[in-house]
């Protein structure tokens, strides 16, 4: 099976459930990062979606990721443009069956995932943005304590251990 591993915000090679799944379930993997055009546009309130510091931080992280992938004999394919159009081209050119990525719970990022599904490939997205998964918590997300100390004490008394990827 040919897959794409789509690096979004999480640029880790270790402790990465989505990447582990891609590696375990794919014969060939194309490693991809897309800097979507929308990141440089202003939002509806005329603020930049991404500031200069974030750009520099991402650039440095991507450079380090490229070096890390290279040490394993792989290459990070970096693109700038519209995410759905880039994926359409990659899927057609490389006969991709599946896309693996981290799940980002934000409106535009979820819309990107829907567009990729519409291209006819399997999309496997993994929530990996926090130490504890929502199903591990001893309460519903809607009942999340307002104060961190209450959250911490609740977690400490239940003995929950973060899941391995």
Residues covered by each model-derived region:
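Trp/Phe/Arg-rich N-terminal binding region typifying the photolyase-homology
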Residues: 1-162
């Amino acid at each position: 099976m040919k897959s794409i591993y789509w690096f979004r915000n999480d640029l880790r090679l270790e402790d990465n459930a989505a990447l582990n799944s891609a590696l375990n379930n794919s014969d060939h993997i194309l490693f991809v990062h897309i800097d979507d055009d929308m990141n440089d546009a202003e939002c509806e309130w005329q603020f930049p979606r991404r500031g200069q510091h974030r750009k520099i931080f991402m650039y440095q992280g991507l450079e380090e990721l490229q070096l890390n992938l290279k040490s394993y004999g792989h290459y990070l394919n970096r693109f700038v443009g519209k995410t759905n159009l880039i994926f359409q081209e990659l899927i057609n050119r490389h006969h991709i069956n599946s896309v693996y990525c981290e799940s980002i719970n934000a409106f535009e990022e979820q819309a990107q995932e829907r567009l990729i599904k519409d291209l006819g490939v399997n999309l496997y997205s993994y929530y990996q943005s926090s130490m504890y998964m929502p199903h591990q918590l001893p309460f519903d997300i809607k009942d999340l304590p307002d104060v961190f100390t209450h959250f911490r004490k609740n977690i400490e008394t239940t003995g929950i251990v973060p899941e391995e990827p």
